[in-house]
Swiss-Prot record:
It comes from Bos taurus. It catalyses: a uridine in mRNA = a pseudouridine in mRNA. GO terms for biological process: mRNA processing; positive regulation of mitochondrial translation; pseudouridine synthesis. The gene is RPUSD3. Its EC number is 5.4.99.-. This is Mitochondrial mRNA pseudouridine synthase RPUSD3. The lineage of its organism: Eukaryota, Metazoa, Chordata, Craniata, Vertebrata. The modification Phosphoserine is found at residue 64.
Length: 344
């Protein structure tokens, strides 16, 4: 496959008991946050109760600043010293243009709501806009700096610190390995898209092409889909979505890069990037049936990519690492149930 390839048997570091078996109680942030809004009389629920194909899915773009602060306060999963950990809802951007409602834009209000007073709170690590999962905040600049140095050192040493859970449409050929690809950002039709580059030259690297690397491990398979753990070893926008599309197994709910995977007579192949525009992910009838979704509902399917675990250094050099965990969103758990995907 030219500039990208899968290498068998990734190095260790996988968390073996993630507690991600799909159960009706794995609500993540959804239930508490929704009840918080309902008590405030919010008039913007996602769908009528009982008719929700994506339970627990919030739409941050419809919230007022006050409502978003309520949701984020209810999404706190851990607070210790200067560190606060949130379980970010899918669809909430961390940064954005001036005037846009983002995590950064409400940090002052959130800080006061959490009792941190006027201390400046920094985002140390966060899942991307379309992904759900962990956000690590710090009210201490020295702690934030120490953690940033730890993450940078870990990347250089090829030691994973973040583990994502993903449901993929398709099953990787190997059960465990590495995905390597040279990627670049390209402005196409007014949108910044990640584009793979085969055999990049030194000039390409100088002009912004980056060699990227991710580990993956297949946890379970069923109904032509897979539950996959992903560990990025480099930092690049939409890296995990682009990597899984290159493996012909796009992430469920990826309405940007899944269009690059074509199918003829049951065989999947990569379509030319230059002639493939982002579009709503198309799922076959059998998969729609297993998910109990109509085609129009599938067009609103959220990205099933969740930052589940962050690995942090201990307080002292000889202390064991600390693991922060964020429960899966309810809609993610529902998908696992529908597809019969369970952690073994």
């Amino acid at each position: 496959m030219g500039g990208w390839r899968v290498l068998g048997q990734a190095s260790g570091g996988w968390r073996r008991g993630l507690g991600i078996r799909a159960t009706s109680t794995a609500a993540g942030f959804g239930t508490k946050a929704r009840h918080q809004l309902q008590r405030r009389g919010a008039s913007k629920p996602s769908d009528p109760p009982g008719d929700q194909p994506f339970p627990g899915l919030l739409r941050p773009g419809t919230f007022s600043r006050e409502e978003l602060v309520d949701v984020l306060r209810a999404a706190v999963v851990d607070s210790k010293g200067p560190l606060v950990t949130l379980n970010k809802p899918q669809g909430l951007p961390v940064t954005g243009k001036p005037g846009e409602l983002t995590l950064l834009s409400v940090l002052p209000e959130l800080s006061r709501s959490l009792g941190l007073g006027e201390q400046e709170v920094q985002v140390v690590r966060a899942s991307g806009k379309e992904a759900s999962g962990l956000v690590l905040l710090s009210s201490c600049s020295q702690t934030a700096s120490r953690l940033q140095k730890f993450f940078t050192h870990s990347r250089r040493a090829r030691k994973p610190t973040a583990t994502y859970c993903a449901v993929t449409d398709g099953i990787p050929v190997t059960s465990e390995g590495k995905i390597q690809a040279a990627l670049k950002l390209e402005h196409i039709d007014g949108v910044n898209l990640v584009v793979p580059v085969q055999s990049p030259s030194r000039k390409d690297i100088m002009e912004g092409v980056k060699r990227t690397l991710s580990h993956f491990r297949v946890v379970a398979t069923g109904s032509g889909c897979a539950l996959v753990q992903l560990q990025p070893l480099t930092v690049f926008p939409s890296q995990l979505q682009a990597h899984m599309a290159l493996q012909l197994c796009p992430v469920l709910g990826d309405h940007t890069y899944s269009a690059r995977v074509g199918t003829v007579l049951g065989q999947r192949f990569l379509l030319p990037v230059e002639s493939t525009k982002p579009q709503r992910q198309v799922l076959d009838e059998a998969l729609l049936g297993r998910l109990c979704l109509t085609a129009s509902q599938a067009a609103r399917l959220p990205l099933h990519l969740h930052l589940h675990c962050l690995r942090l250094p201990g307080a002292r050099p000889r202390d064991p690492p600390i693991e922060l965990l964020a429960p899966l969103p309810s809609y993610f758990s529902r998908t696992l149930q529908c597809l019969g995907l369970h952690y073994q």
